[in-house]
């Protein structure tokens, strides 16, 4: 029984220009928010595909909230074109995009005994303090992901750089729990 993952969020970064005038962007883009006393970047949200941008004076851009890597590429390309259309001529229209983090969820569809899992997986790779947080934090070395395991059987995978790394994290957890007789 394979569990499928659902990508909840993709965070990616790129460099669209050598520098940006964030005050100009805020005045030209409806809905853009810039308050340098509160945060050094400009926040801009797009609806389709749904995502949010953090745009910095350095020309760097962080995109968050997309549900897949293809949407990240689409919204970053659209953002580059939009910035060019409002007068930023030095925009890189085909930027190199770096996925920084993917958050995914999965469901093993069974209740889990987190105390037994904590003992079985070994204390060097896990954090489990139920008084502090209801999930067990399991750090996997390869791929380098963190899997939050909940007693409901739900999993949250963070730190993946690709959907495949997130899927591999879930596969490893499932395999180890099966090997321990806990699934």
UniProtKB/Swiss-Prot annotation:
Sequence repeats lie at residues 7-83, 99-177. GO terms for biological process: DNA-templated transcription initiation. The keyword Repeat applies. Transmembrane segments: none annotated. InterPro entries: TBP, TBP_archaea, TBP_CS, TBP_dom_sf. Keywords: DNA-binding, Repeat, Transcription, Transcription regulation. Pfam families: TBP (PF00352). GO terms for molecular function: DNA binding; DNA-binding transcription factor activity. The keyword Repeat applies. NCBIfam families: PRK00394.1-2 (NF001593), PRK00394.2-2 (NF001597), PRK00394.2-4 (NF001599). Belongs to the TBP family. General factor that plays a role in the activation of archaeal genes transcribed by RNA polymerase. Binds specifically to the TATA box promoter element which lies close to the position of transcription initiation. This is TATA-box-binding protein.
């Amino acid at each position: 029984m394979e569990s499928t993952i659902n990508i909840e969020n993709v965070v990616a970064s790129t460099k669209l220009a050598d520098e940006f005038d964030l005050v100009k962007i805020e005045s030209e883009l409806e809905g853009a928010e810039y308050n340098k006393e509160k945060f050094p970047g400009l926040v801009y949200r797009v609806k389709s595909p749904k995502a949010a941008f953090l745009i910095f004076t350095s020309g760097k851009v962080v995109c968050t909230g997309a549900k897949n890597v293809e949407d990240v590429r689409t919204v970053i390309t659209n953002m580059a074109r939009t910035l060019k259309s409002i007068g930023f001529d030095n925009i890189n229209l085909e930027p190199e995009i770096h996925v920084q983090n993917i958050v995914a969820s999965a469901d093993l569809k069974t209740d889990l005994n987190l105390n037994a899992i904590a003992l079985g997986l070994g204390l060097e790779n896990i954090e489990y303090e139920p008084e502090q947080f209801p999930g067990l934090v399991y750090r996997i070395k390869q791929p380098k992901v963190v899997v939050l395991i909940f007693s409901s059987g739900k999993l949250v995978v963070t730190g993946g750089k690709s959907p495949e790394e997130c899927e591999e994290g879930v596969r490893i957890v499932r395999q180890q729990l099966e090997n321990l007789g806990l699934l």
